[in-house]
UniProtKB/Swiss-Prot annotation:
Localization annotation: Membrane
Classification via InterPro entries: TMEM234
Coiled coil: none
Covalent S-S links between cysteines: none
Lineage: Eukaryota, Metazoa, Chordata, Craniata, Vertebrata
Keyword rRNA processing assigned: no
The protein's name: Transmembrane protein 234
Single GO cellular component term: membrane
Keyword annotations: Membrane, Transmembrane, Transmembrane helix
Family: Belongs to the TMEM234 family.
Pfam name, any one: TMEM234
Amino acid sequence: MAASLGQVLALVLVAALWGGTQPLLKRASAGLQRVHEPTWAQQLLQEMKTLFLNTEYLMPFLLNQCGSLLYYLTLASTDLTLAVPICNSLAIIFTLIVGKALGEDIGGKRAVAGMVLTVIGISLCITSSVPWTAELQLHGKGQLQTLSQKCKREASGTQSERFG
């Protein structure tokens, strides 16, 4: 199935929402280590209260969930073999970029090389699924179908000669 430009852009937006919010969620949830309650149920409730009353956590969380909703809606019309690599691979790249912007250490030259290779791989995935590539593939399939039909005709002609 060929992917439209809108579908690819929606998947890139999902990756940006998922990956871009991860460093923000990590930073905003740093205060959870200070929450200590006697039972696991009280601990859970206090942690939820701490997180959801913190707007620094809540805003990235809601954006992240919007990414999940968009992903779910996009999957209805997008090939899964395209959606998963785009979203997951690019989310990692967006996480590294936003993390670097926030002052985190992302790993130097190897991380940058990994990002470049990931973008090249995703570009190949996208290129192989765009409509013009699909038309070329259909053209090739048409040639294979013609060859297949020719073989069938020759085979049926050979059989009729045997029985005729």
